[in-house]
Amino acid sequence: MNTYHSPMSTGASAQSDVRDYEANLPVIPAQDFQLTDYGAVGDGVTDNTEMFRLAIASCAEAGGGRIVIPAGVWLTGPIVMRSRIELHVEAGALVTFSRDFDQYPLIASSFEGWQVVRCQSPIDGDQLEDIAITGEGIWDGGGEAWRPVKRSKMTTSQWNQLVASGGVVEQSGGEEKIWWPTTAALEGGTIANRLHEEQVRDVAAYEKVRDFLRPNMVSLRRCKRVLLDGPTFQNSPAWNLHPWASEHVTIRNVSVRNPWFSQNGDGLDIESCRHVVVENSVFDVGDDAICLKSGKDAEGRELGLPSEYITIRDCTVYHGHGGFVIGSEMSGGVRHVRVSDCTFIGTDIGLRFKSARGRGGVVEDIQIERIYMKDIIMEAISFSFFYANQEGSARGSDLSQEISEETPVFRDIRILDVVCAGADTALLVSGLPEQPLDGVIIQRYNVQARSGIQCAHAKHLHIAELQAQITEGPLVHLHQCKGAELESIQGKGADGRLLMVTGHESAGIVCREGDAETEGRQISVGPEVRSGVIIRR
């Protein structure tokens, strides 16, 4: 049996952890099937949909094997995977997917945390075992034919060129806002949402909004032993790679690319999966880069499939809304995650944890170490539980709501050995008053940022061996925090303050004596803060 072991656990006591983090590789017969033997032509014009189908059927009937796609430009409609099959794109091979929406039938699928009706994905598989996509070639999802584009993300010349290509423009307040590829795509959102809310499962009911239901590029659902090794996956209609409810998934040595302006242009969304390894891969995308999810709201909680035993290592992220992300759809839970040795350059946010009231779910036992960041546009590290635009989700309120199964829980998160050369904010925590962020450890963090640590509604927060250079405000601002501890802090705020504490519920803030009021660093408390809140040791 082929396995991969997480490197994060060491020592005699770690044996059970090593077994837990195993990811078994697929077992596929060592026999090749040449795509060209089935009449395929790599001229970029010939539609090879039937040739791919014949090759896959022949391979499956022979017990499985490897389908070899040689150098060339191979146009095709959707490819439906089967068990014990490897698609191998050789160097110089470019597989492009048809712009004809009618080639993509509507099917029951999954998107943004819900089980929904979508167009079939360019690469699609459901309830399969032992599948692989390998090689040094390129898969291009033809996403420009599907995706809406926001005017705010285009220069004037880019926008004019896009509008001149066809499609329709959505206007608001007399201004052009969004380009859509077709009128049906523009009008489809409202209808599709209504059908989903009414729990309409009849696929035929969605036919009139087909153009809106753009697919993820690679959708693998309820699969076991999956390997993606080597190719470039680019230009997806929606998310790029989406394993859902699958086990033993290995993704390595891949390049995942989407235009920076691509709507829902995520790189990799691991949703409700177990035993996953992602390593030695590069992401440059239009939304979150490497993201863990587990269903959305009541539907996700009812399904109850957490993402767990996940290892991510040695990856590089360039553009993306977040480098490594958990949420916001995490209602089934995320746990037992190990992330190490990753580099984020120019991402909007580095480490991003997001949720909202209504989600529910528990995120716990997350360990992240040796993360290197440069030129982060917003927060280097962010915890925001006010992500969704729904009642009670406005950031900054101290008003608690009743705790229920809809309340998300984030706890036991360890972030170690992080270097960030440039960010707007070193750390932002926006916890829920009724369910604060619990048990976060940040240790050995070297950061240069405009503002320092801004933390609201957290408990049992431990920050140690922080080296920070900031240019605005206090170094650390704790608001409505309980049981926070600062230790071995180097640096001070631009205003001379090491620490500012506000909020009448703040309590048990421990500041080591060696860190307090030295080198002109001051500690300040708001007038509402009770006496004795700051404990010096």
Regions found by a protein language model. Name each.
Residues N2-R537:
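Extracellular/periplasmic carbohydrate-active domains that bind, remodel
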